[in-house]
């Protein structure tokens, strides 16, 4: 009889956003006359920029001609895209990244789950608490997390690093030594950012302890404060201890188009074994490459027109973030985020739990957000709102919330 991967049976309920979706569908069925506004899941609402659409059309036409047709892409991705990434995302910030250290993928979510394939099962992970659920759930699937404690809401073999109002939602170095450290800045869900000085301490710590940092920089384009690094490789020594995940979803609207990349420096080794070589082997074996059409669109993001157009979209979303943040503060809420990230993290009022506030907002304002407890134990009593809606819906949602 064949056997299943029993680690999947340890996963707690359904994926957070699936649960939210079910609740919202039920509410809509029971209240067909209500106009529900979602400030929940972080999906963009603006269309792809004109220069990106133009590149998509051109590449599509190329696929119709024998002379310009493209099949499988190179394992690492097309050089024209990797060169643009190296130049604009790294060289422009004083960081040198070799083209064979850049691995094109179909998104940061895939890579954040897949990167665990190159690490042994008995590695101990450390995560921020609250945290993007994919980091923990994919390690549950891999058998690294131990057993779930229903009382504490924690896994026995996971080091939780609390992110609280007291530490401005940036974790302290853990007392227990981890092997793999997951960091995400600007942070999802709290919207917090990390200064270069604080991130350097994490790099120094990882080198000292022989740990590796998985650094999710999917929201770096939203950074507005100069003392916050856009890449972990701005820190001295980071190439010896860090893998960086990047995405085109939030900076260029590719949530439905799917494109991202991962940086694995050749300096990063374990017992003399190159993680770059391991990831290249894994990448070439399990992934046939992002489509040529999509990679061409990705390269257009770095054109002068693409840079200007995507910056305009980012400014649009960050204006929404300002509307949410200012409106909530005016209504007496305790909030953070919304300055270097498109997420606003609010303390639930009147002692409500995260899910109680979710139901309260849905039932009384027809507004959807994300319960903080879905991101980890330290998220209880908090709630996430996103700035990815339309400006008009954002204004209306805040009007409803302020009138409660």
Curated annotation (Swiss-Prot):
GO terms for molecular function: L,L-diaminopimelate aminotransferase activity; pyridoxal phosphate binding. Keywords: Aminotransferase, Pyridoxal phosphate, Transferase. The keyword Kinase does not apply. Substrate binds at residues 15, 42, 109, 132, 188, 288, 384. Pathway: Amino-acid biosynthesis; L-lysine biosynthesis via DAP pathway; LL-2,6-diaminopimelate from (S)-tetrahydrodipicolinate (aminotransferase route): step 1/1. Its cofactor is pyridoxal 5'-phosphate. Homodimer. Belongs to the class-I pyridoxal-phosphate-dependent aminotransferase family. LL-diaminopimelate aminotransferase subfamily. This is LL-diaminopimelate aminotransferase. It comes from Lachnoclostridium phytofermentans (strain ATCC 700394 / DSM 18823 / ISDg) (Clostridium phytofermentans). The gene is dapL.
């Amino acid at each position: 009889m064949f056997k299943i991967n029993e680690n999947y049976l340890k996963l707690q309920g359904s994926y957070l956003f699936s649960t939210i979706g079910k609740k919202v569908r039920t509410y809509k069925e029971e209240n067909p006359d209500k106009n529900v506004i979602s400030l929940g899941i972080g999906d963009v609402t603006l269309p792809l920029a004109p220069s990106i659409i133009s590149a998509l059309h051109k590449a599509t036409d190329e696929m119709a001609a024998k002379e310009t047709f493209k099949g499988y892409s190179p394992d690492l991705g097309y050089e024209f895209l990797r060169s643009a990434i190296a130049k604009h995302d790294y060289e422009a910030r004083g960081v040198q990244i070799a083209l064979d250290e850049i691995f094109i993928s179909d998104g940061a979510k895939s890579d954040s789950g897949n990167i665990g394939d190159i690490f042994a099962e008995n590695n101990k992970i450390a995560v921020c608490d609250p945290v993007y659920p994919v980091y923990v759930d994919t390690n549950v699937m891999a058998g690294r997390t131990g057993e779930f404690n229903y009382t504490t809401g924690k896994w026995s073999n996971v080091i939780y690093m609390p992110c609280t109002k007291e530490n401005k939602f940036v974790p302290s170095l853990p007392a227990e030594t981890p092997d793999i450290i997951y960091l995400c800045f600007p942070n999802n869900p709290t919207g917090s950012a990390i200064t270069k000085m604080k991130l350097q301490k994490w790099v120094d710590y990882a080198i000292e302890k022989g740990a590796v940092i998985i650094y999710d920089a999917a929201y770096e384009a939203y950074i507005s404060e100069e003392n916050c690094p856009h890449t972990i490789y701005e820190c001295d020594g980071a190439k010896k201890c860090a893998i960086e995940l990047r995405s085109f979803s939030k900076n260029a609207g590719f949530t439905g188009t799917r494109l991202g990349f991962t940086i694995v420096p050749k300096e990063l080794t374990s017992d003399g074994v190159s993680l770059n070589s391991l990831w290249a082997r894994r990448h070439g074996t399990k992934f046939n490459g992002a489509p040529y059409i999509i990679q061409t669109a990705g390269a257009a993001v770095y054109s002068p027109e693409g840079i200007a157009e995507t910056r305009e979209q980012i400014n649009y979303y960050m204006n929404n973030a300002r509307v949410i943040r200012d409106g909530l503060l005016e209504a007496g809420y305790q909030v953070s985020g919304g300055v270097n990230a498109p997420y606003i993290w609010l303390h639930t009022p009147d002692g409500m739990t995260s899910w109680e506030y979710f139901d309260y907002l849905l039932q009384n304002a027809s507004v959807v957000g994300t319960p903080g407890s879905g991101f980890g134990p330290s998220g209880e009593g908090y709630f996430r709102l996103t700035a990815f809606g339309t400006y008009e819906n954002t204004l209306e949602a805040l009007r409803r919330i302020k009138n409660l």
